[in-house]
Amino acid sequence: MRGRRGDRMTINIQEHMAINVCPGPIRPIRQISDYFPRGPGPEGGGGGGGEAPAHLVPLALAPPAALLGATTPEDGAEVDSYDSDDATALGTLEFDLLYDRASCTLHCSILRAKGLKPMDFNGLADPYVKLHLLPGACKANKLKTKTQRNTLNPVWNEDLTYSGITDDDITHKVLRIAVCDEDKLSHNEFIGEIRVPLRRLKPSQKKHFNICLERQVPLASPSSMSAALRGISCYLKELEQAEQGQGLLEERGRILLSLSYSSRRRGLLVGILRCAHLAAMDVNGYSDPYVKTYLRPDVDKKSKHKTCVKKKTLNPEFNEEFFYEIELSTLATKTLEVTVWDYDIGKSNDFIGGVSLGPGARGEARKHWSDCLQQPDAALERWHTLTSELPPAAGALSSA
């Protein structure tokens, strides 16, 4: 800044900040709380009740629910404890969960959603709900509702059921519930999801949820990826220690078996009832499963039994029964091998999974076998996990 020609003038920072300031009354500085609507405060409470003036709530900072006109929970509805808000930009989902320990089933009642995010050009969506048990990646592990057309407040009232659910699943698994928008011309779009640890459920007690949908949260950085990998590594080590040095086996589905030793017929009755969540072995995303059983040691190689083939399914029902003539004292030294196969025409059949029951088995498989020996003439049904471990003698018989 210059005064007379050739003279240079200097100004301090206070004078610089005062230049070009419009005259007028001094306005109060806005507080952060002024940008959010406030309900009436408690009677006699300080801080001032009522809502902030409308001109102090910029549209960009308004709560997303205010833009979508989301509603509040219905009076008397039982809301889960970690439901903090009933209105988000993604919407809310209402559902019930019930774990039936007696039948080893998890019942999922998908009720309704409210205030979903618009996904189509008409400002609406074609929503459906997809369920997935984690960890687990097979197609049979996924269940879905029907699609509701052109709505942001869909009502489903559908019951989806997982079979073969054990107490171990309830302890370790998580139910992922995703709401998606169906698009016939392109890929379906993800709207939001909810993840419920099954350990929050109590047997035979229905639990009601009304929860805000959340976005998928990716790992933010390589450092978080490293932390996640370290956590997975520790988890796997704990599992390995729990298995007392045994290798970790891939889960390939579940099978429901019935065992009964008949005192009258002097033999073992093996019931192959059904399978659930089998691994898909064919390119169409399904399998053509059948079940084989062996009672080993099998010196005469006459103990093989085989069910019929069920086409294009990951949840087959067999309801077939096989009989092994054997004394109870001899049965105590035997091992029952049960394997599930995918039938292929003109080539070797694919091994899906298997389980062994006998004195050398572990966990539920051993308990089922010992209960059968200790309770003659009682039909005992149990679910068993199929693993990727192929019995040594079964590999040579895969085409049988």
Swiss-Prot record:
<dbReference type="GO" id="GO:0061669">
    <property type="term" value="P:spontaneous neurotransmitter secretion"/>
</dbReference>
<feature type="binding site">
    <location>
        <position position="344"/>
    </location>
    <ligand>
        <name>Ca(2+) 3</name>
    </ligand>
</feature>
<dbReference type="GO" id="GO:0017158">
    <property type="term" value="P:regulation of calcium ion-dependent exocytosis"/>
</dbReference>
<dbReference type="InterPro" id="IPR001565">
    <property type="entry name" value="Synaptotagmin"/>
</dbReference>
<feature type="binding site">
    <location>
        <position position="282"/>
    </location>
    <ligand>
        <name>Ca(2+) 2</name>
    </ligand>
</feature>
<dbReference type="GO" id="GO:0098978">
    <property type="term" value="C:glutamatergic synapse"/>
</dbReference>
<dbReference type="InterPro" id="IPR035892">
    <property type="entry name" value="C2_domain_sf"/>
</dbReference>
<dbReference type="GO" id="GO:0045956">
    <property type="term" value="P:positive regulation of calcium ion-dependent exocytosis"/>
</dbReference>
<keyword id="KW-0770">Synapse</keyword>
<feature type="binding site">
    <location>
        <position position="181"/>
    </location>
    <ligand>
        <name>Ca(2+) 1</name>
    </ligand>
</feature>
<dbReference type="InterPro" id="IPR000008">
    <property type="entry name" value="C2_dom"/>
</dbReference>
<feature type="binding site">
    <location>
        <position position="183"/>
    </location>
    <ligand>
        <name>Ca(2+) 1</name>
    </ligand>
</feature>
<dbReference type="GO" id="GO:0046872">
    <property type="term" value="F:metal ion binding"/>
</dbReference>
<feature type="domain" description="C2 2">
    <location>
        <begin position="251"/>
        <end position="384"/>
    </location>
</feature>
<dbReference type="GO" id="GO:0043005">
    <property type="term" value="C:neuron projection"/>
</dbReference>
<feature type="region of interest" description="Interaction with UNC13D and DYNLT1">
    <location>
        <begin position="1"/>
        <end position="89"/>
    </location>
</feature>
<dbReference type="InterPro" id="IPR014638">
    <property type="entry name" value="Doc2"/>
</dbReference>
<dbReference type="InterPro" id="IPR047022">
    <property type="entry name" value="Rabphilin_Doc2_C2A"/>
</dbReference>
<dbReference type="GO" id="GO:0098850">
    <property type="term" value="C:extrinsic component of synaptic vesicle membrane"/>
</dbReference>
<keyword id="KW-0472">Membrane</keyword>
<comment type="function">
    <text>Calcium sensor which most probably regulates fusion of vesicles with membranes. Binds calcium and phospholipids. May be involved in calcium dependent neurotransmitter release through the interaction with UNC13A. May be involved in calcium-dependent spontaneous release of neurotransmitter in absence of action potentials in neuronal cells. Regulates Ca(2+)-dependent secretory lysosome exocytosis in mast cells.</text>
</comment>
<dbReference type="GO" id="GO:0007268">
    <property type="term" value="P:chemical synaptic transmission"/>
</dbReference>
<keyword id="KW-0106">Calcium</keyword>
<keyword id="KW-0268">Exocytosis</keyword>
<keyword id="KW-0479">Metal-binding</keyword>
<keyword id="KW-0111">Calcium/phospholipid-binding</keyword>
<dbReference type="GO" id="GO:0045202">
    <property type="term" value="C:synapse"/>
</dbReference>
<dbReference type="GO" id="GO:0007399">
    <property type="term" value="P:nervous system development"/>
</dbReference>
<dbReference type="Pfam" id="PF00168">
    <property type="entry name" value="C2"/>
</dbReference>
<feature type="binding site">
    <location>
        <position position="120"/>
    </location>
    <ligand>
        <name>Ca(2+) 1</name>
    </ligand>
</feature>
<keyword id="KW-0458">Lysosome</keyword>
<feature type="binding site">
    <location>
        <position position="342"/>
    </location>
    <ligand>
        <name>Ca(2+) 2</name>
    </ligand>
</feature>
<feature type="binding site">
    <location>
        <position position="344"/>
    </location>
    <ligand>
        <name>Ca(2+) 2</name>
    </ligand>
</feature>
<dbReference type="InterPro" id="IPR043566">
    <property type="entry name" value="Rabphilin/DOC2/Noc2"/>
</dbReference>
<feature type="domain" description="C2 1">
    <location>
        <begin position="89"/>
        <end position="211"/>
    </location>
</feature>
<feature type="binding site">
    <location>
        <position position="342"/>
    </location>
    <ligand>
        <name>Ca(2+) 3</name>
    </ligand>
</feature>
<keyword id="KW-0677">Repeat</keyword>
<dbReference type="GO" id="GO:0099502">
    <property type="term" value="P:calcium-dependent activation of synaptic vesicle fusion"/>
</dbReference>
<dbReference type="GO" id="GO:0005764">
    <property type="term" value="C:lysosome"/>
</dbReference>
<feature type="binding site">
    <location>
        <position position="288"/>
    </location>
    <ligand>
        <name>Ca(2+) 2</name>
    </ligand>
</feature>
<feature type="binding site">
    <location>
        <position position="350"/>
    </location>
    <ligand>
        <name>Ca(2+) 3</name>
    </ligand>
</feature>
<feature type="binding site">
    <location>
        <position position="126"/>
    </location>
    <ligand>
        <name>Ca(2+) 1</name>
    </ligand>
</feature>
